[in-house]
Amino acid sequence: RQLKNSKVTHSWIDRVRIEPASQPLIAPHIDLESKDNIYHALFYQLQIKASYTRSDKSQASEYILNPIAIIQRGVIIYLLATRTDDPDVIIRTFALHRFASVEILESAAQTPDNFHLDNYLDAGGMGFSHPLFSQLPDRGKHTAVELQFTKQAGKSLTESKLSDDQTVTINSDETLTIRATVNLTSQLVWWLRGFGSGLLDAKPALLYEAVLDKPINDAQRQ
């Protein structure tokens, strides 16, 4: 039904809100000229010469980049791009607030063959890899996980699934075992850490090690 009555419409607007699921953060400052040049280059499919400071470095480095796409995640805006000095043509993420300067070049940007943004996102491209998971096949993509929660901690996952193939088992001690197929990423690790003592165990073992941020042995498992 259409809300034709303006009074009713305003009443509805006054009664509906969207609250973020995570802690609200203030967006970092972005150099506006750099941002405009990145967007311009992306629109016209041109390469850029950029001065960029990585999160693990204190000094900026210069790169020639092929802009591919823009993605906003929370308050952070990222540029997907490849570096011209990378023979493997790896698609990398560059946070816009870390660009000190950007120059638009006349050379055409190159996009990897068969790249589709939706497919990239569906495959967990923005989940950010975790160093431990490099030991797993395909760096932990599409991995079967088993998570054991206290009854209270796991309750939300009985309502909102981790994956379409998720199953829930209620154990005799009233703990919950969740089985699902997911991409193992740093985002998953941070999310699981948020459960604190409510997360009792996780498999594969490397996932639980990443959550605890320390090696584990069989004796440490619940």
Model feature map: region roles:
Residues 1-20, 193-198, 205-213, 217, ...:
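Surface-exposed helix-loop "recognition/capping" segments that flank conserved functional motifs
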Residues 1-53:
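Bulky hydrophobic/aromatic content
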Residues 33, 60-66, 142, 163:
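Short beta-strand-initiation
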Residues 39-86, 90-92:
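Loop-centered beta-sheet repeat module
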Residues 69-72, 169-170, 193:
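Well-ordered beta-strand positions
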Residues 80-187:
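Surface-exposed, charged, gly/pro-rich loop-and-adjacent secondary-structure segments at domain edges
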Residues 164-169, 195-201:
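A common structural junction motif
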